[in-house]
A protein has these predicted regions:
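Sec/Tat signal peptide C-region and signal peptidase I cleavage site
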Residues: 20-26
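Positively charged n-region of N-terminal signal peptides that target proteins for export
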Residues: 1-6
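Short, basic/low-complexity N-terminal boundary segments at the transition from targeting/disordered tails
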Residues: 13, 22, 34-36
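Conserved glycosyltransferase catalytic-site signature
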Residues: 290
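Bacterial N-terminal signal peptides
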Residues: 9-19
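Active-site pocket scaffolds in enzymes
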Residues: 293
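Beta-rich carbohydrate-recognition and catalytic domains
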Residues: 27-220, 225-286, 300-345
């Protein structure tokens, strides 16, 4: 998340704790994707006390016929917080959606960013997951009432010794456990778990489940169950040879198992989502060459983070290429766009 925009890295090969997908897997989940994209749908909006220059890291769930979106925002001083937006099902009013700034909610002043929102069905509560130095959570009975989120709490008493750096936290559960995934901005992809009945308490010591070169497994992870396949996918943000952001994908047959590369999506020319497999809708200029922190629109809104391959959509952050190259990172004017799957095989 907080990296120099003009980082240039020759992306090199990866080391995984697993093997590439075999024939049985290839029949259930595609390994090659192409997308179409909108222009910017959501741009930074300010008020009398918030001079916002970027909106980023969106997490969206469908609730009461509309999209509930929590996102990071960045002010003119380069400081991070979060905001809430409520958007029509077809995003037709996204451009005019008025943000609620989360630092107006008690306990949310200062650095809180990179949200994930979901309904935790076993407790009939909504959870907001985010980072504030530590991974934190808050609960609510109604995600459309951002002023009612509880005081943030830490998942851990302190940073575990097994972790050198942690960023971009994501929770997903199966029927037995809840898992906390995150990146390290260092090429490592981490996992911790707790019995589903203990959530949000009792997460064990995180372990590394996949590794690569720093910029080939960087940050911005999001993890999903793929409907009808028995497969899980993890999308992780990478940097291309000129610093462009794109997503690669890992897969696993269970959340606690081995994670392996999905086809050739680990390469900049053949990503899960990136400049080489996205075309913009008719009349829309190529407004970004970076497809950065965001996530797929899930089916439903609960802790299983389920997606359907027949209608994938990815809400991402992008930026004018010249502004992105100029940087520094905390002052890039990110906006939100929506990519829709065009084809896959």
């Amino acid at each position: 998340m907080k990296s120099l925009a003009n980082l240039a890295a020759a992306v090199c090969g990866m080391l995984f704790f697993g093997v590439l997908a075999g024939p049985a897997f290839a029949q259930s989940v595609p390994t090659s994707y192409s997308w179409t994209s909108t222009g910017p749908l959501i741009s930074p909006k300010s008020d009398s006390t918030h001079n916002i220059i970027a909106v980023k890291d969106p997490s969206a769930v469908f609730f009461n016929g509309r999209w509930v979106i929590y996102a990071s925002d960045v002010n003119s001083a380069g400081n991070y917080n979060m905001e809430y937006l409520n958007v029509a099902a077809d995003f037709s009013d996204a451009a005019t959606a008025k943000p609620y700034f989360m630092d107006n909610t008690p306990g949310f002043s200062g650095y809180h960013t990179a949200p994930q929102v979901f309904f935790f069905a076993p407790q009939k509560k909504w959870y907001l997951i985010f980072q504030s130095g530590q991974p934190q959570f808050s609960t609510n009975s109604d995600p459309t009432k951002p002023q009612n989120w509880t005081q943030p709490k830490n998942f851990y008493a302190s940073q575990p010794s097994s972790v050198s750096n942690w960023i971009d936290f994501w929770v997903i559960c199966d029927t037995v456990k809840c898992y906390l995934f995150f990146n390290g901005d260092n090429g490592n992809f981490y996992r911790a778990s707790t019995p589903i009945g203990n959530f949000p308490n009792g997460f064990n010591t995180p372990v590394i489940v996949a590794s690569s070169s720093q910029f080939n497994m960087f940050e911005g992870d999001n993890v999903y169950s793929v409907e009808g396949t028995g497969v899980y996918i993890a999308n992780i943000e990478c940097l291309g040879p000129n610093g462009q952001r794109y997503f690669r994908t890992l897969w696993a047959s269970n959340l606690g198992g081995t994670w392996s590369s999905l086809g050739n999506t680990d390469n900049f020319p053949t990503p899960f989502l990136g400049q080489d497999n996205v075309t913009f809708n008719s009349g829309v200029s190529a407004w970004t060459t970076s497809f950065s922190s965001g996530g797929l629109l899930i089916d439903g809104n609960d802790q299983t983070d389920s997606v359907n391959l027949s209608h994938l959509k990815f809400l991402y952050q992008g930026s004018n290429p010249a502004a992105y190259a100029k940087g520094p990172y905390n002052f890039i004017p990110w906006q939100l766009g929506l990519a829709t799957l065009k084809s896959s095989h």
